[in-house]
């Protein structure tokens, strides 16, 4: 049994606890619905307690540091992880830590912005007469739409400059290619996971990397499936389980609160599967 003192989770809003922004005072309707459906729960009304990492902490007693952030993707995962390694004390005790990753799909591109001295995230998708669509092969610079910010729920720091937004988005449209972006996302994930393996870092994956152009096992002989959490519908498919098993907030509130993130019970189930995989792979938690 490995002696572990910390678990670090990385990912998108699905790891942060999306939909449970109890501090989003700019959205009174959301707060009203959260209070209606979840105020009876005997837990603090904070996002962290409704997320699966928060429930993981409650069930295991192990400190869980949640680096997930709404809107961001794999580039944020890599930045956050490497930032931790800059601390020599942290690195020297890395064998006592477990890292859990929720990789994102396409649709997220990160830039550093000098004018705010921070990273900004561009979320993009296709748009036609029927609305939004997510078939990346059909995207072109004429049918892309986007959201652009450095914090989706802290409305004080959302980028309000349309000129700045349009500059980045116009550059993105001119430099974007579905094949090239799929290739880059795949290669970056292969490199990152290979790095984890080289350092013998304890890690698990709840949502598998985006691989459309490469067979993961061709590049990493051990096979990624050994580290993927096994959910009801298959390995490394946390988001798929939430949708297929009707575990979203929308499902949990009978459609009254429309939100595709995991509900409280959905996150509870996710944390149970994560604990099961932790025990099976590392024998860390009893």
Language-model features: locations:
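Alpha-helical cap/lid subdomain in secreted, periplasmic
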Residues: 82-286
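Serine-esterase "nucleophile elbow" of acetyl-processing enzymes
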Residues: 1-82, 89, 269
């Amino acid at each position: 049994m490995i002696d572990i003192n910390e678990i670090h989770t990385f990912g998108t809003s699905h790891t942060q606890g999306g939909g449970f922004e109890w501090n989003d005072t700019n959205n009174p309707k959301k707060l009203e619905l959260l209070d209606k459906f979840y105020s009876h729960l005997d837990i603090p009304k904070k996002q962290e307690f409704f997320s699966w990492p928060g429930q993981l902490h409650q069930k295991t007693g192990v400190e869980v540091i949640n680096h997930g952030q709404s809107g961001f993707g794999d580039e944020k995962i890599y930045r956050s992880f490497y930032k931790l390694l800059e601390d020599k004390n942290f690195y020297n005790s890395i064998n006592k830590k477990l890292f859990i990753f929720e990789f994102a799909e396409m649709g997220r591109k990160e830039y550093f912005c000098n004018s705010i001295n921070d990273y900004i995230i561009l979320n993009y998708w296709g748009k036609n007469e029927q609305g939004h669509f997510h078939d990346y092969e059909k995207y072109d610079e004429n049918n892309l739409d986007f959201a652009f910010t450095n914090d989706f729920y802290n409305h004080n720091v959302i980028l309000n400059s349309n000129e700045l937004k349009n500059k980045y988005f116009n550059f993105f449209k001119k430099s974007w290619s579905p094949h090239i972006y799929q290739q880059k996302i795949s290669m970056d994930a292969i490199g990152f996971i290979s790095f984890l393996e080289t350092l013998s870092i304890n890690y698990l994956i709840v949502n598998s990397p985006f691989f459309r152009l490469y067979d993961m096992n061709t590049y990493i002989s051990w096979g990624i499936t050994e580290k993927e959490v096994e959910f009801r519908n298959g390995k490394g498919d946390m988001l798929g389980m939430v949708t297929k098993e009707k575990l979203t907030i929308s499902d949990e509130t009978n459609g009254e609160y429309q939100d595709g993130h995991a509900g409280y019970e959905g996150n509870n189930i996710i944390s149970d599967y994560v604990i099961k995989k932790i025990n099976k792979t590392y024998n860390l938690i009893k």
